[in-house]
């Protein structure tokens, strides 16, 4: 998907018509991806995922599920809303968790997992609510007393749960 803007490029005064190419393949409500059979990625960013998962006490399978659902392991992914990198951090969230470069895989994964751990703690270990908060914001989960009634978020929590289960199974067979 190509997006256009009328915002001048910084320092040039020129108008830039091409803004960015959206790279989040699974961001839509019905992205056309079968998450029950899509190929899993157990190898990409192994050391970064393991380090952050260990540091913040989050299952590696859940971290991989979020990365897979958010960016399909593409470090330069950008969403229509402006979320960036592997774990699709919004700039304020990235700043909140000490990420200065959202396109740096190590920083993005560490910040994303730290945020996910914070959400899991806030929602008493409930992955469904934490995933909903990751997608729609914790405030939306609070306002709606659970998973918000947004189609994107409803599908997102199902994707994450399905992918997490598949990553758990795949990791169990490789250990």
Regions from the PLM with identified roles:
Residues 13, 17-20, 25-175:
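Catalytic glycan-binding domains that act on GlcNAc-containing polysaccharides
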